Amino acid sequence: MKQLPDFLKEYKTALQKYRLCSARILAEPLKGGETTDIKSSKFLGTPYLPAGADYPKDKDGKPLILWAQLNFSEIPHLDDYPENGIVQFFVSADKWYDCEEIKVLFHAHTDSPPQTDFPFLTEDLYEECPIWCEHRLQFKEAEEYGGTEDFRCSCMFNGKSPWELYDTLEPAQKEVFDDLFYGTGHKIGGYSYFTQTDPRDYGQEYKNDVSLLQIDSDDKIMFGDTGTAHFFINKDDLKNRNFNKVWMYWDCC
């Protein structure tokens, strides 16, 4: 457990049981003409696909778009998550808001020669994509102690709710509190942030699902009215590297 700020130290024992590690993502929009390495972590861009592998398509045969590629050899290790290999998130080009047409691929090994020619990924395919350009990704390990909308978080501060405590804090303290408890931003794991409500709270079958990836609205990313997109996976499926049942959800203000 990392050192808590002074104004939270009196709650250390109570907060310990809520501690989760996450990998924060710094997403840097690429400038015109820049590209990422085919195996690198990225938002948008060219995916790593072994030669001969089928490119993911929707039920009508239309190519899905690579929203994100995570190379776990570049990412701080998180319990239960892969230590190596590439996880990819492909989403419908024009019906992404329905959250139905998605495909998540896991490449445990990446030493096979990659495909390099994707002529069907034309510019018009990206017209409705909420991620507006390719991003280079960097990662930083973080600790979180709650998410104000995450159904798993019910922490109290000597009888005060997170919101009641927040109202008593100084501006600088509020910034620190936000980092530890609000769950915003791009990240892997940890607590999830919602502008509306946590969909896992509405069905027992989702209670064991964790965040595989959260993509937040940013300078070059916009989900509706500053919303957030999520990809959830059953914790046992994650441990077993079974990504066939990953599901997507997004909401906005």
What is the predicted function of each stretch?
Residues 1-253:
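Preference for intrinsically disordered or flexible, low-complexity segments
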